[in-house]
């Protein structure tokens, strides 16, 4: 891989687990606009799945993925086998403490160690100047940024805003996700309760509310309309996912949600402020 990319200019990496959609295409197009060479990795990483999670059934369609990646501007697709990434005797796991521990870190033990390990391997293999991640996985983005900062890696991590279903769609506002394919059209429509709850929290914040308990309640009031939702968490946090009782006016304030709807685990988040988010130091 490094030999193929040598002397080609600025390299951008878009790491994915495949079953690509418009959210991934947005990442690829962003990389295309900013880099000389764009590499898309497709790897369903077994290390980030728990023993009862959907590794075996995670949606896959390589031919479709190759077509979408190429149409969006990818120059190379890196699609390794698990045995190549984790050969016999592989015994290293990368732990990013602190930011990886709450929320999905608590709900999915070992998940972020798997994420950090595979991201570090991909960054070492591809050696990109920039790597592009969706903000829909906000905690994952925070973990990857901490990993890169702590280990003095050369890659810049670029967060790209979440892509949502069009306003004309019955499921308007639903964050695009490969796991949405598990849901029927009607179930996807009902899954918009997550984004509606987040927008209710946004509205309360815009109205001047800074108490995190009352902000959270604004979202819970919306979620109460969906009896099939098993909520993992709805949290209002400051920078670095800090859970505080009272928010300051920080553009990094965020509301995050995760839960199971019709047996499918969904996550989403939104910024609370409409002010521009500063680039990470």
UniProtKB/Swiss-Prot annotation:
The pathway is: Cofactor biosynthesis; (R)-pantothenate biosynthesis; (R)-pantothenate from (R)-pantoate and beta-alanine: step 1/1
Q: Where does ATP bind?
A: 17-24, 134-137, 163, 176-179
Pfam families, alphabetized: Pantoate_ligase
Q: Which residues, by range, are in coiled-coil regions?
A: none
Question: Which positions does UniProt annotate for beta-alanine binding?
Answer: 48
Q: Which SUPFAM superfamilies match?
A: Nucleotidylyl transferase (SSF52374)
**What are the subcellular locations of this protein?**
Cytoplasm
Which GO terms of the cellular component aspect does the record hold? cytosol
The protein's annotated catalytic reaction(s) are: (R)-pantoate + beta-alanine + ATP = (R)-pantothenate + AMP + diphosphate + H(+)
Binding-site positions, (R)-pantoate = 48, 140
User: Main subcellular localization, coarse class?
Assistant: cytoplasm
Enzyme Commission designation: 6.3.2.1
In this protein, the active site sits at 24 (proton donor)
GO molecular-function terms, A-Z: ATP binding; pantoate-beta-alanine ligase activity
Please indicate if the UniProt record lists Hydrolase as a keyword.
Answer: no
Function of this protein?
Answer: Catalyzes the condensation of pantoate with beta-alanine in an ATP-dependent reaction via a pantoyl-adenylate intermediate.
- Recorded family membership: Belongs to the pantothenate synthetase family.
Q: What is this protein called?
A: Pantothenate synthetase
Q: Which gene encodes it?
A: panC
């Amino acid at each position: 891989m490094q030999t193929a990319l040598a002397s080609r200019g600025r390299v951008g990496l878009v790491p994915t687990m495949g079953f690509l959609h418009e959210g991934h295409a947005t990442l690829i197009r962003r990389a295309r606009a900013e880099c000389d060479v764009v590499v898309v990795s497709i790897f369903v990483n077994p290390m980030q799945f728990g023993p009862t999670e959907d590794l075996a059934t995670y949606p896959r369609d390589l031919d479709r993925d190759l077509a979408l990646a190429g149409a969006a501007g990818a120059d190379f697709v890196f699609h390794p086998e698990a045995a190549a990434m984790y050969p016999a005797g592989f015994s290293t796991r990368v732990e990013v403490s602190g930011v990886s521990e709450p929320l999905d870190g608590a709900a999915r033990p070992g998940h972020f160690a798997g994420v950090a390990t595979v991201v570090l391997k991909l960054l070492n293999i591809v050696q990109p100047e920039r790597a592009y991640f969706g903000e829909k996985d906000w905690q994952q983005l925070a973990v990857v940024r901490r990993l890169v900062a702590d280990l003095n890696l050369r890659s810049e991590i670029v967060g790209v805003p979440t892509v949502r279903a069009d306003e004309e769609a019955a499921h308007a506002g639903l964050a695009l996700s490969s796991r949405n394919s598990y849901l029927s059209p009607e179930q996807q429509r009902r899954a918009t309760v997550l984004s509606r709850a987040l927008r209710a929290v946004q509205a309360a914040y815009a109205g001047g509310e800074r108490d995190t308990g009352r902000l959270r309640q604004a979202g819970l009031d919306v979620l109460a309309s969906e009896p099939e939702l098993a909520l993992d968490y709805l949290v209002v946090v400051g920078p670095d996912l800090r859970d505080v009782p009272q928010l300051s006016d920080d553009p990094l304030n965020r509301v995050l949600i995760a839960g199971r709807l019709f047996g499918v685990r969904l996550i989403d988040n939104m910024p609370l402020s409409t002010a521009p988010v500063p680039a990470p130091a």
